[in-house]
């Protein structure tokens, strides 16, 4: 526990943190990667280049300072970050490195004096221990469950299937021939790659796209413009190649009773975790209402349409609606979308009038903000809306 003086000292630095903004974390990362370049093998350097990770870390530091006397308020954020950390295989000793550079950054940017540095040192130590302990629990859970493992495990690509102009699915089975750990629908795999020509090892998280079967995993990858890893997977990864995987993780998952109605809302590649949820509901014979609402640019980039249709046929109460923002002539001829333009949920209000319905959202942040606002305006409670950001977390 932190004493009152330490808490007061840390909270007194909040205005300075807010004024400085992500410049603080930019300095921190530049310093850390200069002194500890080996950490480039762990961090997603693409998120470093576009600034997303710097913004996310700054928001986390500011949130911690603001809630330092109320740590339970931070537990949902801690769980999200701890789950992600396990896919990077973060170890306790790396927290010492981060703490060293955080304090050095505060000193170099602000020269706040030893009292402030000592207070932040204590505060960081408390937070680091929260993460270390939770991550140890997750590592132990992953290693002890049936088909689970520690660290990375070699998997072979057994199928590679283009699903649209931008999305390709990969089916993976363990090289050792053993069983694989089950997961909750909505969770992701940690994929570790360092092909020839890559300056650093790259680690990515890709959502699992079907119900667990104990034999292997399926992920789907969108080709991102300029994306080093996604383009390598699309262009160079082949059936028979071996990649390293970390056990499934993630705090975004579906957990509902048989009589709970569910709405799955997605845009683009955001449908990937929703596919695992829909597959799980279909194979469980879910009796309550299930809605599938999806937005895509057009039919060329709309993946898994046939699979969704087939799964929906096995559900007794299923409604699907697809929006194409800019349908092409082939889309119009085939009639494979329901509405043109942006997703407008107000026209489907009757499909989710049940107050117990749970809503799961995934897609670009702007899309999720747009969809969540519509839901709230239609009377949906915030606690019934669950969402996942690909990349560093952002609040809707």
From Swiss-Prot:
Q: Where is this site: Involved in heme-bound ligand stabilization and O-O bond activation?
A: 29
PROSITE patterns on file: FAD_FR (PS51384), GLOBIN (PS01033)
Co-factor: note:
Binds 1 heme b (iron(II)-protoporphyrin IX) group per subunit.
Binding positions for FAD per the UniProt entry = 188, 204-207, 389-392
EC numbers listed for it are 1.14.12.17
Q: Which reaction does it catalyse?
A: 2 nitric oxide + NADPH + 2 O2 = 2 nitrate + NADP(+) + H(+); 2 nitric oxide + NADH + 2 O2 = 2 nitrate + NAD(+) + H(+)
Q: Which cofactor does it need?
A: heme b; FAD
Domain FAD-binding FR-type spans what residues? 150-255
List ligand-binding residues for heme b.
Answer: 85
Where are the annotated segments for Reductase? 147-396
Superkingdom classification of source = Bacteria
What are the Globin domain coordinates in residue numbering? 1-136
List the NCBIfam families.
PRK13289.1
> What role is this protein assigned?
Is involved in NO detoxification in an aerobic process, termed nitric oxide dioxygenase (NOD) reaction that utilizes O(2) and NAD(P)H to convert NO to nitrate, which protects the bacterium from various noxious nitrogen compounds. Therefore, plays a central role in the inducible response to nitrosative stress.
Name of the molecule in the record: Flavohemoprotein
- Tell me the organism: Escherichia coli O6:H1 (strain CFT073 / ATCC 700928 / UPEC)
The gene that this protein is the product of is hmp
């Amino acid at each position: 526990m932190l004493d009152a003086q330490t808490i007061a000292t840390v909270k007194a630095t909040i205005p300075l943190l807010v004024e400085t903004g992500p410049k603080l974390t930019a300095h921190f990362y530049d310093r850390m990667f200069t002194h500890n370049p080996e950490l480039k093998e762990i961090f997603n350097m693409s998120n470093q280049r576009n600034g997303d990770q710097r913004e996310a870390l700054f928001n986390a530091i500011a949130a911690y300072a603001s809630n330092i006397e109320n740590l339970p308020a931070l537990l949902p954020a801690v769980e999200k970050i701890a789950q992600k950390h396990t896919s990077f295989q973060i170890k306790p000793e790396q927290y010492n490195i981060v703490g060293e550079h955080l304090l050095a950054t505060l000193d170099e940017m602000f020269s706040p004096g030893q009292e402030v540095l000592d207070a932040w040192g204590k505060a960081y130590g408390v937070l680091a221990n929260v993460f270390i302990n939770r991550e140890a629990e997750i590592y132990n859970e992953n290693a002890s469950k049936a088909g689970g493992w520690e660290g990375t495990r070699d998997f072979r690509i057994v199928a590679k299937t283009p699903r649209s102009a931008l999305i390709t699915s990969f089916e993976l089975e363990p090289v050792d021939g053993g069983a694989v750990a089950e997961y909750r629908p909505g969770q992701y795999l940690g994929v570790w790659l360092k092909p020839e020509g890559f300056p650093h090892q790259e680690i990515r998280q890709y959502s699992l796209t079907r119900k667990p079967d104990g034999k292997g995993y399926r992920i789907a990858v969108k080709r991102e413009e300029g994306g080093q890893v996604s383009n390598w997977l699309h262009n160079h990864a082949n059936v028979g190649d071996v990649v390293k995987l970390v056990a499934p993780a993630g705090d975004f998952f579906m957990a509902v009773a048989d009589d709970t109605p569910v709405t799955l809302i997605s845009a683009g590649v955001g449908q990937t975790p929703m596919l695992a949820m829909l597959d799980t509901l279909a194979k469980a014979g879910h009796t309550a209402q299930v809605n599938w609402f999806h937005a895509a640019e057009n039919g060329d980039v709309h993946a898994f349409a046939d699979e969704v249709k087939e799964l929906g046929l096995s559900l007794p109460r299923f409604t699907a609606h697809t929006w194409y923002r800019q349908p092409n002539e082939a889309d119009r001829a085939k009639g494979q979308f329901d509405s043109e333009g942006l997703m407008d949920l107000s026209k489907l209000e009757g499909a989710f009038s049940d107050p117990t319905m749970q809503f799961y959202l995934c897609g670009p942040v702007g899309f999720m903000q747009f969809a969540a606002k519509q839901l709230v305006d239609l009377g949906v409670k915030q606690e019934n809306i669950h969402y996942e950001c690909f990349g560093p977390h952002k609040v809707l």
